[in-house]
Amino acid sequence: MQPAYYEDLEQIKNKIWSMLDNAIKDRGSPFRIPVFICGNQDDFDGRIVVLRKSDQSNNLIQYHSDIRSDKIAKLKFNKNAALLFYDKEEKIQVRLKVECIVNHNNDITKQSWLKTGHMSRKCYLVDNGPGTESDTPTSGLKSELDNFEFTMEQSEAGYKNFTVIQCKIISIEWLYLAAKGHRRAKFDLENNKEHWLVP
């Protein structure tokens, strides 16, 4: 038996947002770690990010990053990007086209930083930015920080590297895999249009 949203566009949209919202709370949700793809025709790549916020009222999702990451330079050159989600159990793939805003040292980052846990802040304490070449295997952290004993006060030094990437959703493509017959739909949020697609 197929789910209620199998042939109902409104229920599909509700299901997508429900999965995004749930991913914020559920660390085990496959939608919590989408692939984020950015760049241009000559230089683009993808990486896993951790979903930190889902805001249907503003068609927005967001994640955190290091200002020194190479994706920040890519986004400053081209704010258009894509995210890919897949849930094997639900048999649902979701593709988002988004426009990105890089927030650094502003009210948005301050609010998010206050909610960022002690251990999560460790990522932003590395001396050199992510992707910097090294002659030896390294975490990038000073020896006194390369453990679980650093203090919350010490973690504050990472704030200068902390960014919040807000992704304004332009369109959503949904694919449901079913033996009876796959279903695919597109939601154009910019123009408030939706239609079925051949899978």
Could you tell me what each predicted segment is?
Residues 1-199:
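Binding-site signature for planar aromatic cofactors or substrates
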